[in-house]
C-alpha cells in the first residue's frame, strides 16, 4: 500500500543487523520503500563475527533486541526490527496495548504477513483463484485457518526454505505464490528469491505497520484483530539438549519409544491423529491408517489433540 507508506513515511523505525550483513542493504531498502525515519543501533552497525554486544545474535531472543528496544524507548519509535547475521531472518518488537515493548514471534509474524497480503489482494481485486501459500509442518495451524477462510490453497512442507522453494517450482507458470514462512522467523513474500530473506521481510513488516497505523491501529492491535477473527493460538518450544554420542543414542531411543508407545493423551486432551513422517503414515483415534503426501520421509512425529493442539517431536543434531 504505497499510499499508506507515503502518509506514514515519518514513522520511527529502529533497525539492527546485530553486527551482520543486513547493515549493507536493509536500511537502504527501507528508505527506498518510502520510510524516511529509520534509526540504527550504532554499536551494532559494526561488522564483527564475535558479536560483542550480544550473548547470541539470534533475533528470536529478547536479549539480541535489547539495545534496539532501548533506543526505540529513547526516541519513541513504533517498530523494532533485527536481522540475523546472514540477513535471512528477522525478529520484531512493538508496543502492546499497555505501551510496553513486546516481541512478536515467528508464527505471529507469518500470520500478519499473510493477513496483510490477502487483505491487499482482495482490496485490489487481484484474487484469481489460483493463489497458494506455504508453511512448514511445525508452523501454527492458524495460518492454514486464515488461508482456508479466504479460499487460498495452503500447502504444508518440511522445515527449511528449500522445501518452500520446491512447492513454488512445482507450480511455476500454473499458480500464483503469495507467501510462505516458518515459525523460526523466516518469510518469503515473492518468488523471485527462493530462500528466506530479511531484506524484503523488513520492508513488508514496516509496510504492514504503516497500513495498520493508517487504519488507526498499532501492529499489536492488528495481531489482536487476527486472533478475534480467526481464533487464538499460542506456541512454545521445548529444547532438550543431549550432546555427544550417548546423546545421539538417547535421542534415537526417545524417538523409537514414541513410535512404539504413542501417547493417547497430551495435556489432558485425547490424541485424535498421529503423523509419522518417517513412515509417511497417519493414524486416527479409531486406528485408521492413511498415507501422508510428502516428497520423502523425515524423522518427525506429530500429535493432534481433541482441543486443537498440535505437538511436534523433531530431533535436530544434539536437540
Report residues per predicted region.
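Gly/Ser/Thr-rich active-site loops/lids in small-molecule metabolic enzymes
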Residues: 36-40, 100-118, 200-204
